[in-house]
């Protein structure tokens, strides 16, 4: 019988997390469940910092970026001694289950606590869109809008100065944001971690475009592939074209969530309560073909793989 649960946000924040918190709280209250907000992710659970949330506690947060509960990375959770303290705090607080909003690292933490007997439901909250078992993660579409706005502005100045602009996009090891940004932003080149990248190949393509009369270009690249400032210098040296690199950085994580992220987060938050009431307690939520689904969190973190969007890449290559 689920009477009292905790909700936390973990790892990198993403726009829409507040909407998910709101969804969990209000759906829980509608079923007579007490919901406690745990501050700063797993760290707050370790330190036993939590507060009872009411209907009014989550008023006026659906439109806010970030997370009102705070977030953190807490790799110490992998230690047996730390997990023992966490489980003791869960027991002392009489929490029957946890709802954990975050990325794949947060899911691993949820899996570990589930293994120790605490029912956990994972909700995918990350702009990277790199979580298995879901087409989209909370925050992805808002981050994409932020990136497109930046690319549009860079195109204005790149066109004026006839220069090449490199835009580094977040995503870790997933190129979804970069591919989508390249299509929506009209980028001339796209570089993602899923495909092998050679700087000289890019230079050759830029030279070909220049020979065809192209006077400026935008290159979208996922983070961690290379040093974009070194890449800019290499391109400038090889082509003679002024080249500048822009790292969008953490600005991509901020801002008011767009409507789709608010709706997705609200649906997933409410669905987490539905799953707990049905007896699920080792699962993560996803959306596939616009329908909410759930998967065993062990499968999602160990065996399932995020499907690569070859269709988007094919489109990007045709248009770039």
UniProtKB/Swiss-Prot annotation:
Indicate where this protein resides in the cell. Answer: Cytoplasm
Name the residues that bind Mg(2+): 104
Domain of life of the source: Bacteria
Q: What residues bind substrate, as annotated?
A: 126-128, 163, 170-172, 223, 244, 250-253
Pfam families named among the record's database cross-references = PFK
Which amino acid positions bind ADP, per UniProt? 22-26, 155, 186-188, 212, 214-216
InterPro entries in the record: ATP_PFK, ATP_PFK_prok-type, PFKA_ATP_prok, Phosphofructokinase_CS, Phosphofructokinase_dom, PKF_sf
Q: Pathway it belongs to?
A: Carbohydrate degradation; glycolysis; D-glyceraldehyde 3-phosphate and glycerone phosphate from D-glucose: step 3/4
Q: Active site annotated at which positions?
A: 128
Q: Needs which cofactor?
A: Mg(2+)
Which enzyme class? Answer: transferase
In this chain, ATP is annotated as bound at 12, 73-74, 103-106
What cellular component GO annotations does this protein have?
6-phosphofructokinase complex
Q: What SUPFAM superfamilies does this protein's entry cite?
A: Phosphofructokinase
Q: What's an example GO BP annotation here?
A: fructose 6-phosphate metabolic process
Query: What modulates its activity?
Result: Allosterically activated by ADP and other diphosphonucleosides, and allosterically inhibited by phosphoenolpyruvate.
Q: Which terms does the record give in the GO molecular function aspect? A: 6-phosphofructokinase activity; AMP binding; ATP binding; fructose-6-phosphate binding; identical protein binding; metal ion binding; monosaccharide binding
- Catalytic activity, reaction form: beta-D-fructose 6-phosphate + ATP = beta-D-fructose 1,6-bisphosphate + ADP + H(+)
Might you give the EC number(s) for this enzyme?
2.7.1.11
Q: What does this protein do?
A: Catalyzes the phosphorylation of D-fructose 6-phosphate to fructose 1,6-bisphosphate by ATP, the first committing step of glycolysis.
Note the NCBIfam families from the entry: PFKA_ATP, PRK03202.1
Binding partners and assembly:
Homotetramer.
What protein family does this chain belong to? Belongs to the phosphofructokinase type A (PFKA) family. ATP-dependent PFK group I subfamily. Prokaryotic clade 'B1' sub-subfamily.
> What is the protein name given in its UniProt record?
ATP-dependent 6-phosphofructokinase
Supply the source organism's classification: Bacteria, Pseudomonadati, Pseudomonadota, Gammaproteobacteria, Enterobacterales
């Amino acid at each position: 019988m689920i009477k009292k649960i905790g909700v936390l946000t973990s790892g990198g924040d993403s726009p829409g997390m507040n909407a998910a918190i709101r969804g969990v709280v209000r759906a829980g209250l509608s079923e007579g469940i007490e919901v406690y907000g745990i501050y700063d992710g797993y760290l707050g659970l370790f330190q036993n910092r939590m507060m009872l949330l009411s209907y009014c506690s989550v008023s006026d947060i659906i439109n806010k970026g970030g997370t009102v509960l705070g977030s953190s990375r807490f790799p110490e959770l992998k230690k047996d001694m730390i997990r023992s303290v966490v489980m003791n705090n869960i027991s002392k607080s009489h929490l029957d289950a946890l709802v954990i909003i975050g990325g794949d690292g947060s899911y691993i933490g949820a899996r570990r606590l589930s293994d120790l007997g605490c029912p956990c439901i994972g909700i995918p909250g990350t702009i990277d869109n790199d979580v298995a078992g879901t087409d989209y993660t909370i925050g992805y579409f808002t981050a994409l809008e932020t990136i497109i706005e930046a690319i549009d502005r860079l195109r204005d100045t790149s066109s004026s100065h006839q220069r090449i602009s490199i835009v580094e996009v977040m995503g870790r090891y997933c190129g979804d944001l970069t591919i989508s940004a390249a299509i929506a932003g009209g980028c001339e080149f796209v570089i993602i971690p899923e495909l092998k990248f050679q700087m000289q190949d890019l230079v050759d393509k830029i030279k070909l475009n220049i020979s065809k009369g192209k006077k400026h270009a935008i290159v979208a690249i996922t983070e961690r592939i290379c040093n974009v400032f070194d890449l800019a210098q290499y391109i400038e040296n090889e082509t003679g074209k002024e080249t500048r690199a822009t790292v969008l950085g953490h600005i991509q994580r901020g801002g008011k969530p767009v409507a789709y992220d608010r709706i997705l987060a609200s649906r997933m938050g409410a669905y987490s309560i539905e799953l707990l009431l049905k007896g699920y307690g080792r699962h993560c939520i996803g959306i596939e073909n616009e329908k909410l689904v759930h998967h065993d969190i062990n499968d999602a973190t160990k065996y399932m793989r995020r499907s690569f969007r070859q269709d988007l890449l094919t489109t990007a290559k045709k248009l770039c």
